C-alpha cells in the first residue's frame, strides 16, 4: 500500500470544540422541574401582617417547647423558617372547613338615613333672600343640581314623632299667613297705612268658639319678650318689615292627635273689630286672610282685598315674628323655627300695600281697609348635608312606628315650583349602626405601637444592621401607625376648627337676623363654616366611639369589637329593626350593647397582644448586638484586673512573710548548731589562742 492510499484510509482527525465553556454554562442552567411562569391570575404577595408574625412566633415557641430546645433568637428563627416551609409546601385540602367568628362591629356613617324628629335640635335652613325672610342666606344651592330629584324608596322607623310637612296625618298642614306693619297717619280721612307680606306658613287648628278665636294653650309658655298690644314706636315711621321674635299671649295648636301635640307661641296677626266705647251691639268677629283653604290660589289670583265695617278695624298682635312650632306631648322638645323657611319658600310671597280710610255713611263713621298687590317674589330654601328632604307620598304609621314612601325624590332645596299635593320629610344621614360581622379568624386587637417602639428603641438606635432584620415586623405596623396618626391629626384639626368657628360666630347672629344688606360672599363663607361644624360634630362623635373601642387590627373604615355576637340574645330581626331606625321593645337595646362592648374593650386594654413575644424577640436581638458584647467584655476585664491585682498583692504579701520566716528559721538553726558544737568540746575555749576563739565563734 503506497503512502498516498494509507493517507486516504487514515481516520479523520477530530475537530476541536472552541465553545466548551458556553455549553457547560448551558448545562448548568438546565433544570428537570417545571418552569415557574407568572400567570395573569398570579397575585403579588402582600407583606406579612402583624397577626401572621405573632402567630408564627407562637407556633415556633410551642415547637421549641415540645422538642425541649432552648429558646434563643437563632432557634426561634430556624423554627419559624421551618414552619413557613411546611405551610407553603403542604397543599391546602379541598373542602377544608373554614372557622366562622362573628363579632359586633360599629359602622360609622353607613349609606342609611333616619327621620329628623321633634326631639332633635333645629337644623340649618338657608334662604336666597334675607330681606323678606330672616335667617342665614346662601344663593349657591343646590350644591349638586344633577343629583336633585333622585328616586328612592324608603322604609324607616322612628322613636319620636318625625317632622313632616304636608296634607297627611302626622304632618303639619300648610296655610297662608300675613305679616303686617301698621303706620298711623294724621290725615282726616286715613287712619293707617299698611305694608303687608303674605306667604305660605303653618296652619293652626281653628275652633270657631266664642268670638271665633283660635284654640289656645297657656301651658309651656317660653321665656321671651311678650308681643306688644299697641303699635311700637319704632314702627310709626317705617315702611319695611323688621322681624323680631316675641311671645304671644297664648299658643296656637298646630296639631293634636295620635302623633302628638304641637303648639306655636309666635303671634298670628289678624283684623278684628274694635268695639271699645261702642254702645250698640258690636260684632267682634275676626276677619283675616291668614287662613285660606285654597292655599296657593289665594296668592296667585287675589290681588285686591277690601274690608268694610261701621266699626274701626284693628290688627291684633303687633309684632312681626316667624312661627316656632314645638312638640309638648307625648314628649317636650325644642322649638323648630327653621320649618317655616321651608314652607314659605314653597310658593312665592306677595307684597301688599294699602290703608284704612274713614268715611261717613248714614251719618255714621264707616271704615274701609283697602289692600293691593302687584309684586311677588320667588324664594328658595335649602338644607345641606347631612340633611336632606324626601318629597313624595309619605305615609307615617304610628302603630308600627314606621315611615314608608315609594317613588319618592331626594332633594336639598324647595322653591316656588313645589306641589303641595306631596309631603316633605326631613331626613339625615345615620351617624353609625351596630351590626354583626363574620370573620374567618378570631378577633385580635392592634398592637401598641408606642410599647413596641419603646421596647425596640435600644436596639434600633445602636445597630443599624438590625433594621433589616425587623423590616417584616415594621411592614405590618405601617398601616396601623398611619391610621392612628391620621386620626390624631384629624381630631386635633377638628378641635381647632370648632374653636375658630365658635369665636367667629359670636357676633354673627345679629347680622343674620337683621334686614340690612350684607356681603354675600362673606355670608356664604360663614354658612359653610356653620354647616362644617355640624358635620364635624357628627364626625367627632364617631371618632369618640372609635377611641373608646378596641378594634380589630384588619379594619380601618369600621370597627370590629371583641364582643362576640350571640344569636340567641340578639336575633337578626332585632338587628334589622335597628338598621331601619326603629326603637321599641323588640328593637336592639343599643345602650345595653354599648355597655357590654365598652366593658369588653376595657378588658382588652390591659392586655396588649404580642407584647411578651415582642419583648422576648427584642431581648434576643439585644443579646446579639456586638456593642453589648463589647460593653460586657469591657466591664468584665476591669473587674478581673482588679481581682488580679488583689490576688497579686496577697501573693506578694505571702511570699514576703514566707521569706522572713525562712530567715528566722535559718538563724535559729545556726544558733542551735553553734551551741551543739560548743557543748561537745571539753574545757571550752581554755588554752586556745584568741584567734581560735574568734574563728570558733564566727563558725
UniProtKB/Swiss-Prot annotation:
Post-translational modification summary for this protein: Specific enzymatic cleavages in vivo yield the mature SU and TM proteins.
Region ranges (Disordered): 1-47
Glycosylation sites: 100, 128, 153, 274, 355, 372, 461, 507, 554, 566, 585
Cleavage (site feature) positions: 465-466
Family: Belongs to the beta type-B retroviral envelope protein family. HERV class-II K(HML-2) env subfamily.
Description of how the protein assembles with itself and partners: The surface (SU) and transmembrane (TM) proteins form a heterodimer. SU and TM are attached by noncovalent interactions or by a labile interchain disulfide bond.
Name of protein: Endogenous retrovirus group K member 8 Env polyprotein
Lineage of the species this protein comes from: Eukaryota, Metazoa, Chordata, Craniata, Vertebrata
Amino acid at each position: 500500500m503506497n503512502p498516498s492510499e494509507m493517507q486516504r484510509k487514515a481516520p479523520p482527525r477530530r475537530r476541536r470544540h472552541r465553545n466548551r465553556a458556553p455549553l457547560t454554562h448551558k448545562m448548568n442552567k438546565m433544570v428537570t422541574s417545571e418552569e415557574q411562569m407568572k400567570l395573569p391570575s398570579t397575585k403579588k404577595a402582600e407583606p406579612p401582617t402583624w397577626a401572621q408574625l405573632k402567630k408564627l412566633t407562637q407556633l415556633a415557641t410551642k415547637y421549641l417547647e415540645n422538642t425541649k430546645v432552648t429558646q434563643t433568637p437563632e432557634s426561634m428563627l430556624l423554627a419559624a423558617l421551618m414552619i413557613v416551609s411546611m405551610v407553603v409546601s403542604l397543599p391546602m385540602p379541598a373542602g377544608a372547613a373554614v372557622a366562622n367568628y362573628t363579632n359586633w362591629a360599629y359602622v360609622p356613617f353607613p349609606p342609611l338615613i333616619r327621620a329628623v324628629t321633634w326631639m332633635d335640635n333645629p337644623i340649618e335652613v338657608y334662604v336666597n333672600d334675607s330681606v323678606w325672610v330672616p335667617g342665614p342666606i346662601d344663593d349657591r344651592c343646590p350644591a349638586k343640581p344633577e343629583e336633585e330629584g333622585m328616586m328612592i324608596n324608603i322604609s324607616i322607623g322612628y322613636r319620636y314623632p318625625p317632622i313632616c310637612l304636608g296634607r297627611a296625618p302626622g304632618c303639619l298642614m300648610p296655610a297662608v299667613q300675613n305679616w303686617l306693619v301698621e303706620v298711623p297717619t294724621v290725615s282726616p280721612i286715613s287712619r293707617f297705612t299698611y305694608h303687608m307680606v303674605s306667604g305660605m306658613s303653618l296652619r293652626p287648628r281653628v275652633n270657631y268658639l266664642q268670638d271665633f278665636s283660635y284654640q289656645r294653650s297657656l301651658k309651656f309658655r317660653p321665656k321671651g319678650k311678650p308681643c306688644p298690644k299697641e303699635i311700637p314706636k319704632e314702627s310709626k315711621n317705617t315702611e319695611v318689615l323688621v322681624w323680631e321674635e316675641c311671645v304671644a299671649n297664648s299658643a296656637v295648636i298646630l296639631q293634636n292627635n295620635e302623633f302628638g301635640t304641637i303648639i306655636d307661641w309666635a303671634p298670628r296677626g289678624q283684623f278684628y273689630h274694635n268695639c271699645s266705647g261702642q254702645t250698640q251691639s258690636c260684632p267682634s268677629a275676626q276677619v283675616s286672610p291668614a287662613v285660606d283653604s285654597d292655599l296657593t290660589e289665594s296668592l296667585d289670583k287675589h290681588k285686591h282685598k277690601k274690608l268694610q265695617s261701621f266699626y274701626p278695624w284693628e290688627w291684633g298682635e303687633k309684632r312681626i315674628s316667624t312661627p316656632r312650632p314645638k312638640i309638648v306631648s307625648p314628649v317636650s322638645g325644642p322649638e323648630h323655627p327653621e320649618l317655616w323657611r321651608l314652607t314659605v319658600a314653597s310658593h312665592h310671597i306677595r307684597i301688599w300695600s294699602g290703608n284704612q280710610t274713614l268715611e261717613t255713611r248714614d251719618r255714621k263713621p264707616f271704615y274701609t281697609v283697602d289692600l293691593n298687590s302687584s309684586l311677588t317674589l320667588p324664594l328658595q330654601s335649602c338644607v345641606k348635608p347631612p340633611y336632606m328632604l324626601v318629597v313624595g307620598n309619605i305615609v307615617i304609621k304610628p302603630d308600627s312606628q314606621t315611615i314608608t314612601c315609594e317613588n319618592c325624590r331626594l332633594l336639598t332645596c324647595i322653591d316656588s315650583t313645589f306641589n303641595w299635593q306631596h309631603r316633605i320629610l326631613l331626613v339625615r344621614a345615620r351617624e353609625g349602626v351596630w351590626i354583626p360581622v363574620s370573620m374567618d379568624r378570631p378577633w385580635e386587637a392592634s398592637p401598641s405601637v408606642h410599647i413596641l417602639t419603646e421596647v425596640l428603641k435600644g436596639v434600633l438606635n445602636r445597630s443599624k444592621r438590625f433594621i433589616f432584620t425587623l423590616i417584616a415586623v415594621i411592614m405590618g405596623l405601617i398601616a396601623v401607625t398611619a391610621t392612628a396618626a391620621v386620626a390624631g391629626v384629624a381630631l386635633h384639626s377638628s378641635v381647632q376648627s370648632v374653636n375658630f368657628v365658635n369665636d367667629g360666630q359670636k357676633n354673627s347672629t345679629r347680622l343674620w337676623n337683621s334686614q340690612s344688606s350684607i356681603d354675600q360672599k362673606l355670608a356664604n363663607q360663614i354658612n359653610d363654616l356653620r354647616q362644617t361644624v355640624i358635620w364635624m360634630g357628627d364626625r367627632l362623635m364617631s371618632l369618640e366611639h372609635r377611641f373608646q373601642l378596641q378594634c380589630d387590627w384588619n379594619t380601618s373604615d369600621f370597627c370590629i369589637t371583641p364582643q362576640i355576637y350571640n344569636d340567641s340574645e340578639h336575633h337578626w330581626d332585632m338587628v334589622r329593626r335597628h338598621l331601619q331606625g326603629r326603637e321599641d321593645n323588640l328593637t336592639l337595646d343599643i345602650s345595653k350593647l354599648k355597655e357590654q362592648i365598652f366593658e369588653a374593650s376595657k378588658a382588652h386594654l390591659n392586655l396588649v397582644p404580642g407584647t411578651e413575644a415582642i419583648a422576648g424577640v427584642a431581648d434576643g436581638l439585644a443579646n446579639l448586638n456586638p456593642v453589648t458584647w463589647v460593653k460586657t467584655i469591657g466591664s468584665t476585664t476591669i473587674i478581673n484586673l482588679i481581682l488580679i491585682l488583689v490576688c497579686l498583692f496577697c501573693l506578694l504579701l505571702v511570699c514576703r512573710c514566707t521569706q522572713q520566716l525562712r530567715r528566722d528559721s535559718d538563724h535559729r538553726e545556726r544558733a542551735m548548731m553553734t551551741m551543739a558544737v560548743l557543748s561537745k568540746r571539753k574545757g571550752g575555749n581554755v588554752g586556745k589562742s584568741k584567734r581560735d576563739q574568734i574563728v570558733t565563734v564566727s563558725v
